[in-house]
Amino acid sequence: MSVKIPRSVYADMFGPTTGDRVRLADTDLIIEVEKDFTIYGEEVKFGGGKVIRDGMGQSQVTNAQGAADTVITNALIVDHWGIVKADVALKDGYIAAIGKAGNPDIQPGVTIIIGPGTDIIAGEGKILTAGGFDSHIHFICPQQIEHALMSGVTSMLGGGTGPSHGTFATTCTPGPWHLGRMIQSFDAFPVNLGLAGKGNASQPAALKEMIEAGACALKLHEDWGTTPAAIDNCLTVADDYDVQVMIHSDTLNESGFVEDTIKAFKGRTIHAFHTEGAGGGHAPDIIKVAGLPNVLPSSTNPTRPFTKNTIDEHLDMLMVCHHLDPSIAEDLAFAESRIRKETIAAEDILHDLGALSMMSSDSQAMGRLGEVIIRTWQTADKMKKQRGSLPQDSARNDNFRVKRYIAKYTINPAIAHGVARLIGSIEQGKLADLVLWSPAFFGVKPDLIIKGGSIVAAPMGDPNASIPTPQPVHYQPMFAAYGRSLFASSVVFTSQAAVAEGLAKKLGIQKSLYGVENTRSGISKKSMIHNDATPNIEVDPETYEVRADGELLTCAPAEVLPMAQRYFMY
């Protein structure tokens, strides 16, 4: 016997279903459920008097016979490929299925089997996303990693050796010895980690040495001299080893202008960091490269989004990060040349057009690594408020805009850096790196962070309390962050050459190495999901005004942002 219930009652019980709409945090962004994989009247839910009990929603199937290790029930998945309601099965640390969970002995349409060996995470009324991937990390201190994890970031790629002056300014780990020590330290951290070697060299030998020693990418940084010769050499070596190259080009235009840098690319694929230019790069027109078919452009979050405070905070930030002296006129001029309100405003719009493909932090080196996700959605909200709905969206929802923006910190950096087969989206066969959110706290404070199928971090109340929720509630590492579980649930990104050389055994590390792949000619701007636009971008050298296909890109700075102070009162 079936009974009809109001949508509101159903949503309270099982979460939203097809056609229901959900607001993301306190933004103006509204998503609508496109499809519900569960079956009305056959939903599974855990708890006293609920469905997932022996002989009801729980079968007798063993894990060896195919029952899931964990099922996240009735979750609202938000990913680049869709916004859908489903049960999600995790098995052996990977995403095993997305569909309808239950007991196939008594329930129809079951594609995920719940057995006695299955644990349940209640996803009713929650949003499930892939773990974030921050591909612009200055590894200045190890404490960064926990802060990033608690924000919903489960993978980090960058460079450094700790609080050295080279690391303060540049995202690269120079030389085999430093690479080895850093990779050995990665056994302590429950996230996926990768290192970029220093790419600034005009001859290949030193770069090859670093790739074989475990670098999964090479970084060209102007503070080490990003000359056309270094660019060409670095890309040539990267092509030979199938690793990505990231570039921070020549702000001072000493060794050439943006046209010379583009010429040195020779059409080869490259990841352009902080493409707007406030983080560094040819002044004032590095932003032009965002329109090239071979450039994978990203932003760092200090300029995201453009607000009334953005310009003021940047100058001091830049002086500290790049070891500049405010008493030296040339240093001050260098800093001031990088901070331009016109290009920062254009950056907002280029993100909304899908011309800027990725978001990252620039951790402690002008960026805040715990705010990659927050600032992505603040940018999306600002653009909706200022530009209205995208042409691809209906009046009812912002689904396409949401898919465009979530791709910027999940699947697109994974594609750019050759790890999309492992991470970056909620798809069958990928590592179960997942984040569960309450809609009201979406993008700001996660409910649960899952790493390699295990709960790695969560907000937790007083451990001495009689229930888990009494204050004070703090984000804490969970069991997957300790012991050998840590090694089993995360990997180190390296080159395939390092894997073939047996680097893990040489360094005596416990984590598995994952060799990056398909980072060169196999990908281009067209590979950037929902963010593959290649407009012709022009910058006026006198006024710094930016035009895309002839249209002036300008917008007002935000006076107030969502996902901000009201979430951090305590």
From Swiss-Prot:
Query: What keyword terms does UniProt attach to this protein?
Result: Cytoplasm, Hydrolase, Metal-binding, Nickel
Query: Where are residues bearing N6-carboxylysine located in the sequence?
Result: K219
Q: Name one GO biological process term.
A: urea catabolic process
Q: Which domain of life is it from?
A: Bacteria
Which residues of this UniProt protein bind Ni(2+) 2?
Answer: K219, H248, H274
- Taxonomic lineage of this organism? Bacteria, Pseudomonadati, Pseudomonadota, Alphaproteobacteria, Hyphomicrobiales
User: Is Calcium found in the keyword set?
Assistant: no
Query: Where does it sit, as one GO cellular component term?
Result: cytoplasm
Binding-site positions, substrate: H221
Query: The Urease domain covers which part of the protein?
Result: 131-570
- What is this protein identified as? Urease subunit alpha
Annotated Ni(2+) 1 binding sites: H136, H138, K219, D362
Modification after translation is described as: Carboxylation allows a single lysine to coordinate two nickel ions.
State the Pfam families in the record.
Amidohydro_1, Urease_alpha
- HAMAP family registered for this protein in UniProt: Urease_alpha
According to its UniProt record, in which pathway does this protein act? Nitrogen metabolism; urea degradation; CO(2) and NH(3) from urea (urease route): step 1/1
Q: Where are the transmembrane segments?
A: none
Instruction: Name the active site residues.
Output: H322 (proton donor)
- EC code(s) of this entry: 3.5.1.5
Q: How is the cofactor bound?
A: Binds 2 nickel ions per subunit.
Q: Which reaction does it catalyse?
A: urea + 2 H2O + H(+) = hydrogencarbonate + 2 NH4(+)
Main localization, broad class: cytoplasm
What subcellular compartments does it reside in? Cytoplasm
Transmembrane helix as UniProt keyword: no
